[in-house]
């Protein structure tokens, strides 16, 4: 499969050099220490917006819209889209890529969370159930084995 022209990493911080680190979510696909990025600009922005406040969220597999389970994005916050060269990245899973090296962004864009409302919505129970179907390690909010679902890529 051909690599995309650019990859994207969303964050609440403007980061000059992205350093490999271990994600905080419970997905086994995110067990490696690295710099996580996506080929989908709207996913990087949507996840950064969701993380602008304490939320539990997941990406809808079909629409790529971010489904919020708990909490709500901070509409007053600003997030940053780090545009990356894919040369040091390998595909981890579908539209997700991973680099084991430090990555310097080609460009960094600033976005107001209030301008990104089209990238997320409140999740229905049906959507959450579908999402959790093949993810035994994940737990819905309220299940105290794992407090909540957090993304950090």
Tell me what each language-model feature is:
Residues 1-32, 49-50:
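ADP-ribose/NAD+-binding catalytic cleft of ART/PARP-like enzymes
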Residues 47-153:
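Conserved NAD+-utilizing ADP-ribose enzyme module
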Residues 13-15, 42-44, 87-89:
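Short, solvent-exposed loop/turn segments at secondary-structure junctions
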